[in-house]
Design a protein with these regions (language model features):
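Gly/Thr-rich phosphate-binding beta-strand-loop-beta motif of the actin/hexokinase/Hsp70
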Residues: 1-32, 137-168, 221-227
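Structural motif
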Residues: 7-10, 100-104, 148-150, 277-282
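Conserved phosphate-binding loops in N-terminal lobes of ATP-dependent enzymes
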Residues: 11-100, 168, 222-226
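Phosphate/pyrophosphate-binding loops at sites that engage ATP/ADP/AMP, CoA/4′-phosphopantetheine
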Residues: 84-97, 194-204, 256-275
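Glycine-rich phosphate-binding/hydrolytic loop that grips phosphoryl groups
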Residues: 130-142, 148, 178, 182-184, ...
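Phosphate-binding glycine-rich/basic clefts of nucleotide- and phosphate-handling proteins
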Residues: 160-245, 279
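Helical "lid/coupling" subdomains associated with nucleotide-phosphate turnover
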Residues: 221-300
């Protein structure tokens, strides 16, 4: 049997083996009256109890105590350990695993992660940087730029496509992570509700959370239709609004343009480039079109 693989991306910590997903949860923790809750259970309260939420622990991996009154008893390493305990329940027969990690984790972070895993009796075979793990074909281009999206930003890795793929440089681009995009889409939907229904779904944390829970499905519809219909849940009755799909692209245009500006630092003259996207970032509405027009290179 092939070893299990743990892909570390806080937008979805994923354990899979033989092409089967065994565990997938967002890297977010809620400190509640019932104790710590991980993943989707925490996301259900992100807009209701924002001060009780921590979603920085994978990106700020250290043993220092967290500077937050509700998490002051914990370090980010403690929270990583807590989520890894959940992951461990899905590892078959305590099989050794391969870790795929994002470029923002350095050697010190990986050493700490190895120590956390050892303390939990999780055996790690090796660590593989995510951009290298994702590159499975030859593009016959001199340079590859790999993009992946996380909760707070996008990682961009510049790689050479020679005999063996290697990473030359990696940057972390803030202001264009999933949470920033979601917040802008929520703002668009809210403004449309006020305009079409004279109703503000953000007037209470509960209705705001109900709307937030729908965003990913709404964006999936945006990529398939010219116009989307959205059911807005209020306290008394469901209401319906319609928004042109192009408006969702316009709502995050500033984020996309920021990404393009930062990516230009990785390009140089007299080189052939391919921009390689993970599935999650490839599904963002309008992004591929913008990348193709901005860089005049193959995007896949």
């Amino acid at each position: 049997m092939s070893p299990a693989i743990l892909n570390i991306n806080n937008s979805g910590i994923c354990l899979f083996q033989n092409d089967k997903v065994l565990y997938r949860e967002i890297g977010i923790i809620l400190n509640s009256d019932q104790g710590l809750l991980v993943g989707s259970k925490a996301m259900d309260s992100r807009r209701i109890l924002p001060k009780n939420i921590n979603y920085d622990f994978w990106g700020d991996l250290s043993e220092s105590k967290i500077r937050s009154s509700l998490f002051s008893d914990y370090s980010s390493a403690d929270l990583v350990s807590y989520q890894l305990k959940e992951v461990q329940q899905f590892i078959n027969n305590n099989d050794p695993i391969i870790i795929i990690y994002p470029s923002y984790l350095d050697s010190e972070n990986l050493s700490l992660l190895l120590g956390i895993a050892n303390a939990l009796d999780i055996q790690i075979i090796t660590f593989i940087e995510s951009s290298i793990a994702a590159t499975k074909e030859k593009y016959f281009a001199s340079k590859i730029i790999h993009l992946d999206i996380h909760l707070h930003g996008i990682t961009a890795s510049l790689m050479t496509d020679k005999k063996d793929v290697s990473v030359e440089e990696s940057i972390f681009i803030e202001e264009c992570g999933l949470f920033q995009l979601y917040d802008n889409w929520i703002k668009l939907i809210t403004e449309s509700c006020i305009e079409q229904l004279r109703y503000d779904p953000m007037h209470s944390a509960k209705t705001d959370q109900l709307l937030y829970n729908k965003v990913s499905k709404i964006i999936d519809e945006v990529t398939k239709k010219n116009k989307v219909t959205i059911n807005i849940d209020s306290e008394d009755v469901s209401k319906i609004i319609e928004i042109n799909s192009s408006a969702f692209i316009d709502a995050v245009n500033k984020n996309y343009r920021h990404l393009v500006t930062k990516l230009r630092s990785l390009f140089s003259r007299n080189e052939n480039y391919v921009i390689q996207l993970t599935q999650q970032i490839a599904e963002l509405p309008g992004l591929i079109t913008l990348l193709e027009s901005s860089f005049s290179c193959f995007v896949r």
